Amino acid sequence: MAAVLMVHAAVAQADTTADTIAPDDHGAYLSVAFGNGRIYGGNASGYRWMRGRTFEVRAGRQQDEVFGLALPSGWTMRVDFVHYNEGHPDNNHRDGFALQWLAVHRFSPMWTGELGAGPYLSMNTTEIATPTGNTQIDDARLGVLLSAGLRLAVPGPSGTHVRLGYNHVAMHTVHRSDALVLGIGRQFGAAEPAPDVVPDGRLWLGGTFGTSITNMAGTHGAHAGVLEARQYAERWGIGYKFLFEGDDGARVDRRGLAGQLWYVQPVTPRLSMSAGLGPYVAANRRDGNRTATNLLISFQAERALSARTRAIVNFNRIKTFRKTNDRDLFQIGLLRRF
């Protein structure tokens, strides 16, 4: 949550250059919302409400055409990268990442509606019965996230609004969920990196430091560090990371090398959001140095401090797909151009 709050603070203090540009014109979209909901069906048991700990973070890009075809007046389309947490009902703590396509309709200068759908890769920390007793697992599944939203424009920078959202998760053989969330968002105008801070073509080196949390009981948080090399090419980037995840005292003390493909969305001339995905090969010292290939998913905010320096804050999810030892890293650091 620290990473979420830092990103939200960065947005609130972002450059005002984009304010003079009309929103909904290929600009970035950012929102954060909190709420409550309920699970049902499948493996749902015990107390099924989410205990008021539901939240979502959205980062997207608005489009006014689909496959080169202009949309009707008042309509736009948006593609969102979503981190969604379904709260804490009994024996189920599910969260994950979705890629959503949304149809957006402006009813009036004050009111805007949204409908969206897309694949949702989830990770559920739960206990299952085994011959030796109950065993805690990280259950990875692919489902669908369906969303509807109603936005009300509020005073502030252009595009700022309050957003009331409804989310439905459908997933085969396991529980489904419904939730209402309320938060604040902003549709930014079109933006490109300022000429003096365009990152393309150069090699960037840097490091981040923060904490890591193993998504299993009986562990504690640890200090974690990452060394990174990256190159940008307009909206895309390629990065390589060496991760030191830290020792949780019981299950995980991993370190290894990851490669990621990034999509970069400018928010203002000096602020951008990006999402990265790629393989992560690591050895776990608490498992006899056994080496395995995992998936590294990252969500990052970058602020250009100068032509050669960028401040970054990110959230990283390490997914093992072995039903155990998934991990979250929250990091802050710097990239330097060479």
Where are these regions (language model features)?
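Residues that define the transmembrane beta-barrel architecture of outer-membrane proteins
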Residues: 26, 49-57, 91-99, 140-146, ...
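Short glycine/proline- and aromatic-enriched beta-strand/turn motifs that initiate or cap beta-hairpins
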Residues: 12-76, 80-86, 177-237, 241-244, ...
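Residue-level signature of outer-membrane beta-barrel architecture
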Residues: 59-63, 103-105, 152-154, 168, ...
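Outer membrane beta-barrel transmembrane domains
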Residues: 120-140, 144-145, 149-151, 249, ...
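Sequence/structural signature of outer-membrane beta-barrel proteins
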Residues: 35-44, 80-90, 120-129, 167-173, ...
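Extended, hydrophobic interaction surfaces within ordered domains
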Residues: 49-53, 58, 65, 73, ...
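N-terminal signal peptide c-region/cleavage motif recognized by signal peptidases
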Residues: 7-9
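Repeated loop/turn-to-beta-strand initiation elements of outer-membrane beta-barrel proteins
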Residues: 65-77, 109-113, 154-164, 190-195, ...
